[in-house]
Regions:
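Predominantly flavin-linked oxidoreductase catalytic cores and closely associated redox partners
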Residues: 4, 8-12, 16, 20, ...
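Short aromatic/basic micro-patch
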Residues: 33, 86, 149
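A generic structural signal for short coil/turn motifs at secondary-structure boundaries
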Residues: 25-27, 83, 137
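N-terminal FAD cofactor-binding segment of flavoenzymes
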Residues: 5, 11-68, 165
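Glycine-rich adenosine-cofactor-binding loop
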Residues: 1
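Helix-loop-beta segment of a Rossmann-like dinucleotide-binding subdomain
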Residues: 70-89, 98, 126-128
């Protein structure tokens, strides 16, 4: 969006993205249901440009499970998915990277930020990437390349849960003082190809209850994508 605004107003602005994965989307495993509202605002003609939002959300089901039975519950309003899409979030990220590249955003896949850089006044100056090509004992190998420093007016950290640099920022700027502790969850996901007779494209099912006990938060999902594929997880 920054590049769009810079082009619109005729201003020079460089935007750089560091992606630690081998490509954008390589570390995005989610099969997700997303609202297109932000995409409508960012790229209004996303459908014409071939965004991989191929499966409109259809039937919504919310079930309470016991060990032997499933009880259908009213779907909470915040879980209604009319107008949303079932997607592979990795594919969406790859497509967004293509759109960003067309706007001359500099994207560096395979580079992880290893250090936060600071100005003399203590404010964030940017980040430095890690050295590449060191041997197992830390010495410079034949293909050694030193890390590079990236300086910016604004630096955004999108490391996900417990990011290594984000933790240092928490400590330096006391960002966790006086706030609730973070909450983490662990889950599994698989992508199944099922028989066409069993596939209901656009179907969305969420469950709560069994096999969790009554004191533990958790649940499962089943999303029917295109091509007889089902994203299933817990």
């Amino acid at each position: 969006r920054l590049r769009q605004l810079a082009i619109q107003h005729g201003e020079e602005l460089t935007v750089c993205v560091l992606e630690k994965g081998s490509e954008v989307g390589a570390h995005i495993m989610s099969g997700a249901v997303i609202e297109p509202r932000a995409l409508n605002e960012l790229i209004p003609d996303w459908q014409a440009k071939g965004a991989p939002l191929n499966t409109p959300a259809g039937e919504d089901r919310f079930l309470f499970l016991t060990e032997t039975r499933a009880y259908k519950l009213p779907t909470p309003p915040q879980m209604h998915n009319h107008g949303n899409y079932i997607v592979s979030l990795g594919n969406v990220c790859r497509w967004l990277a293509e759109q960003a590249a067309e706007l001359e955003v500099d994207i560096y896949p395979g580079f992880a930020a290893a250090e936060v850089l600071y100005h003399e006044d203590g404010s964030v100056k940017g980040v430095a990437t890690g050295d590449m090509g060191r041997t197992h004992d830390g010495e410079e190998g034949p293909n050694f390349a030193p890390g590079m420093e990236l300086h910016a007016r604004q630096t955004l950290f999108g490391e996900g849960c417990r990011g290594s640099l984000t933790k240092t920022l928490f400590q330096r700027f006391n960002l966790r003082d006086g706030v609730d502790p973070q909450v983490f969850g662990i889950g599994i996901k698989e992508l199944w190809e099922i028989q066409p007779s069993l596939h209901r494209r656009g179907s969305i099912t969420h469950t709560t209850g069994w096999p969790m006990d009554m004191k533990t938060y958790g649940g499962s999902w089943t999303y029917h994508l295109e091509d007889n594929l089902v994203s299933i997880g817990f």
